[in-house]
From Swiss-Prot:
EC number in record: 2.1.2.11
Record protein name field: 3-methyl-2-oxobutanoate hydroxymethyltransferase
Species of provenance: Staphylococcus saprophyticus subsp. saprophyticus (strain ATCC 15305 / DSM 20229 / NCIMB 8711 / NCTC 7292 / S-41)
Cellular component, GO, one term: cytoplasm
Pathway(s) the chain acts in: Cofactor biosynthesis; (R)-pantothenate biosynthesis; (R)-pantoate from 3-methyl-2-oxobutanoate: step 1/2
Quaternary organization: Homodecamer; pentamer of dimers.
Family: Belongs to the PanB family.
Function description: Catalyzes the reversible reaction in which hydroxymethyl group from 5,10-methylenetetrahydrofolate is transferred onto alpha-ketoisovalerate to form ketopantoate.
Amino acid sequence: MKTLNQLQDLKVNKEKISMVTAYDYPSAKQVEAADIDIILVGDSLGMTVLGYDSTVQVTVADMIHHTKAVRRGAPNTYLIVDVPFGAVGVNDQYDLEIAVKLYKETDANAIKAEGAHLTQYIKNCSNMGIPVVSHLGLTPQSVGIMGYKMQAGNKEAARQLIEDAYAVQQAGAVMLVLEAVPSDLAAEISDKLDIPVIGIGAGKETDGQVLVYHDLLNYAVEHRAKFVKQFGDFSVGIDALKQYNNEVKAEQFPGEAHTYKKQIMNEVTE
């Protein structure tokens, strides 16, 4: 498993960091086998594997359940778990209790929190010994306000994002995810910050990249964002399922090769 210090060294040495968002045991096993640096269990699991309309419906219990499965599948990969909507911003005591619960019960290496307004939360968690990854730019828990579109597209917003990035680093964030922002802005932030900056829809000059397992493999994807590249095609599984269905209906499956041939009924009826 790469440690946080080793991930930091990758940034210093200008070696790119790979991150994949995964949600269950089998996908985690594949990600670890591919030697990906980091796995993120994102609250996007709400839409991707639970069928919710948005990330807002995801609960702490959902995150713990899936992250524990991912950890079992990838025991040797740096693991980050999302803090879901409603699990932060109530009060300091409640927020910390949930942070400890997520961090402790999942065996994650860090938690991830969305938004520039959480600097005090980052400080509080850091003081407790919980590493926090910040997420700026397009933050899915706030799409009801900002929408699914590129962020920081004008001068004022770009300046604000730079200030926010510095602020979360100063608060103690160990890493930053930048989503859906202009590539030159992401490059500037990556260059100026000391912590690793992982981009998604933020160009190639960030310290690393993250994509969702299902997106990059075209696995039950209903909408593909502009910044997603398809590296494989799991949709062919539908063809396999259709073939299975047809062979069952046609009494072609199971065949002799898939059948236990020992004759037992004569013995049973004796």
